[in-house]
């Protein structure tokens, strides 16, 4: 009985050994210095060629005009965001970052909302969106 267990154990060890080493990639054997040099050097023909094109004055002016248009549109968008009126604050409210457990009133900031963590044991008013 002990001999069969010993044989089964060695068979199991050899099977594990062969399965592990059969999945590993075979190692490359370098026979001389020439193969070492060819494997280590980078072949420049493998990379695509790069062409350098000089910009003429028209394309530079167009790109400057486009950049100015983008800047002006960003400024207009920021001006529109600032011009939006805020709703008046109600008297019974919770300030931002203060505790707002469910029986408490709503948050003072219209962009803030009450966020609860740890199974509604720790709640606080937080601003979720910066664009509000």
UniProtKB/Swiss-Prot annotation:
Subcellular location: Secreted
Pfam families the UniProt entry points to: Agouti (PF05039)
Disulphide bridges, residue numbers: 93-108, 100-114, 107-125, 111-132, 116-123
Glycan-carrying positions: 39
Record's compositionally biased regions (Basic and acidic residues): 63-79
GO CC aspect terms: extracellular space
Keyword annotations from UniProtKB, A to Z: Disulfide bond, Glycoprotein, Knottin, Secreted, Signal
Location of region: Disordered: 62-93
Role, per record: Involved in the regulation of melanogenesis. The binding of ASP to MC1R precludes alpha-MSH initiated signaling and thus blocks production of cAMP, leading to a down-regulation of eumelanogenesis (brown/black pigment) and thus increasing synthesis of pheomelanin (yellow/red pigment).
Entry remark concerning the domains of this protein: The presence of a 'disulfide through disulfide knot' structurally defines this protein as a knottin.
Name of this chain's protein: Agouti-signaling protein
Gene name linked to the record: ASIP
């Amino acid at each position: 009985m002990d001999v069969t267990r010993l044989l089964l154990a060695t068979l199991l060890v050899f099977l594990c050994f062969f399965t592990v080493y059969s999945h590993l990639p075979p190692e490359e054997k370098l026979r001389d210095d020439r193969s070492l040099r060819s494997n280590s050097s980078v072949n420049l023909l493998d990379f695509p060629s790069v062409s350098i094109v000089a910009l003429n004055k028209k394309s530079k002016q167009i790109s400057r005009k486009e950049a100015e248009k983008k800047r002006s549109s960003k400024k207009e968008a920021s001006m529109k965001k600032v011009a939006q009126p805020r709703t008046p604050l109600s008297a019974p409210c919770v300030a931002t970052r203060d505790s707002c457990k469910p029986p408490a009133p709503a948050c003072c900031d219209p962009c803030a909302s009450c966020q609860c963590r740890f199974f509604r044991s720790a709640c606080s008013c937080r601003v979720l969106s910066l664009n509000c």
